Every structure is written in structure tokens, then in C-alpha cells.
Amino acid sequence: MERHVPPLWTYGDDNNRKLNEQVYITEFIKANQVRCINNQLYSPDGAFEDGRAKQLIIDDIMPYVKSNHGDKAEKLLRSIKTLCYAEPPTPQLDRLHVANGTLTKDENGQFTVFSEDKEFCLNRIPVNYNPDAPNPERFMKYLDDVFQKDDQVTLQQFCGYCLLPTTVLQKALIIIGDGGEGKSVLGAILNGVLGDSNCYNESLSVLQSPFGVANVENKLLFIDDDLSENALKNARTFKNLVTNKTTIQAQKKFVQDNQIKPYVRFICFGNYTLQALYDLSEGFQRRQLIMQAKPKEPDRIDNPFIDREILENEAEGVLLWLLEGLNTLILNHFKIAVSDRTRAQSDSFKQENDSVLMFLNECDGIKIGEGLRAHSSTLYVAYEHFCRDNMLIPLKERSFLSMLKTKGRNLGIKGHTEPFELHTSYGTKRARGFFGISVNDNYININF
């Protein structure tokens, strides 16, 4: 009869063996090949969640620890993290880690070279690379049902871009529609192909919390499947993450803050475009690529399990679709293809969300032209009236003046730092203001 060999990390008599914590910690790290980066365990398969680690520890030590297994597992996990601490690695842009190995670039810079060798990584895609995977017919039909053909090219390239840990495109994809088209199914499919540990599913509003940034550390994709109509009170974090090339301070609950270099990309689905309450800058607008889903065909019958069926049967084919998009993007030097229709829609939506630009383009109470002048306070009163009439949220005074200088530049409007006199129906007043624009007294009188 074969004799049972006790674990190396135990000691004592056969009937009363005990746990050697120091040896167990070392053996756990060795067996699971884990490293601790910013208090998170990672293995060659990517993120190694604390819950999974504690369950493995409890299963191991249960025969050798009489009580308080949860507390003991918590203590051991803390020691494991301390012992296998490592500095964050530089994101790898020359390889992709898939379930069955590693993809690297060929002589043309395309991800076509496959090896079954696995390396330590922060982001492993939980789908096998199979160059002979059949065409994902369900997935392609879903795309045809929901998106225009030329928009599918943009989608393929942007979604493929999410495989790489980089923010080089400096764009967030905002997909909008009237509701019921099935646009957010794409988010569920991407979450399944990229992997739960590589995606963060939440509302963008979470980024306004002090601990919001820490949630996207080492994530490939942020998915908001129900974009709120409420504007962001502070858009700075969103802008920084979309274009990030440096380290950012991340606050975490109950642990020390640390510096992270996030590379998360954003895909948001909703009935509204993304708006910022106090940021109408070109930078905020430029970071958004706005795409509109096709209206739902009246006779289309939806399959409520389509995302599950695609992931169960076509995940390898969808991965090839993503790789094709990424490789095309690389060939185009990371210049994403955008249809004229979508580009025009993006520009239109951006203007609709820009109250200052709308004021300059649409307000009947102002004139724009050479030789005209207006005081800043008068312009702001006219702007407030325009926003009230059009149910827009006006900016604060200083923000309005800053945006007026920026938005008015192309229209010949210039701020003047020296006070000047103006004669109006209210009398003569001396104050600072702008050249190239004037306000009709009657417009203000009517609105008072």
C-alpha cells in the first residue's frame, strides 16, 4: 500500500502534523509563480484574486490548523504578498498573452508569430489563439444588425486596440442610440473575450470618487453600459486616463496610496453623449469618438442570450477579429479609420454639448465682426439668458470668459485686458471686455 507523503510545509508526527508557516509561504509563491504588485497578486495567467488565493490557502491548511482558518489564511496571504513584492513591470507592446501561449510581432510589426511558451504577465486574454478558428457568424450578424458597415471598421480597430496596454489613440469610444438596439451587448462580448480580470464594469461617475482611479489599475478596458445623462462634475480624471502617459496617484482604502501608470481604454454605451458640467474645452471633446448605433429594425427578433452564445461558440473567432483590427491599426500607424458620417455626427454632438459655441453660433442677441466691442459682464448676462432660453447649464463667469477666448479665436473675437468705454442705453460704462463681438441692448432688455 502506497504511503501518503505529507506536504513539505508541515512537521511533527504523522497523526499530529502542524503547519510550518514560513515554508508554506515560500512553497505557495513557488507553486503558483506569483508576484505582488501594488498589493495585488499576479501569476503567468494574469491577476490572481485575493479570494481565490485565500480559498487555496484554506484548502491546503485545513487538515493542519484546528480553528480560525479564515484568519490564518488572511495572515498567510499578507505574508505571501510581502515576500513576493515586485516593482510594476513596463507594459509590453511587442507581445500579447493569450490562454494557450504568446503572440509576438513578425518582421512587418504584425501579431502573427505564436508560441506555446507562457511568460509572467499582468493581462492574459482567457481565449486560445487559433488561426484556423471559423468565422464568428453569430457575432458578425450581430454587428450587421446594430452597426453600419463603415462603423464596423472603426469598431474593429478600436476593440483590437484594447488588446494592447497603451493609450496611444487618446480616444474614448462613446456609442449612443435611442435604446433597444443591442449596442451594449458588445460590452458583454468584449468583457468575455478580454477577461473579467482585465475589464472594469462601472459607471464613469465612479472616477469622481477619491478611490476611483485605483479601480482601473492594470485594466485593459473600462465598460460603462448605461452612460448617465448627468454631466461629470470633474472631467479631469477622465481626460487624464484617456491620454495617460505618466504615473497617477491612486488612493486605496485601508492601504497606502501608490503611483500607478494606467492604460485603461473606455467604451461607453448610452442614450446620451458624455458631458462635463464645467469643462467645455477642446481637450475634453477631442478625447471622445462618438458613434451612433443603427435604429432597430421593426421586424428584428432579439436573442436575449446572444452574448453568451457568441462567447461559448465563437470566442476564438472574435479574438481573430480583434487581432485583425489591431494589425490594421498598426499598419496605419495608429490612425483609426472613421467614416465621414460618424465624424460629422461627432462634431455635431460636440457642438450640442458646448453652450459657449452654441451661444456664438446661434444667439440672435449678439453680432460678430470687426470693429465691434462688448464688456465681459454684458456678454455673460447675454450668455446666461441664452442658456436659460435653451435649457442649458451655464458655466461660471471665469469659465465662460476662458472658453470665450478659446472658442472665439477662430471668429476673430479677442479679449482686451485694458478697460474701455462703451455707450449703451444704460449709460456709459468703463470695463474690460472683448473686441469682435457686441450685444444688442434689446436682447438683454427683453430677457430682464
Question: Which residues make up each language-model segment?
Answer:
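Short, small/acidic-rich helices and loops at N termini and domain boundaries
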Residues: 1-4, 40-68
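Feature primarily recognizes SF3-like P-loop helicase cores of small DNA viruses
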Residues: 1-37, 63-181, 185-448
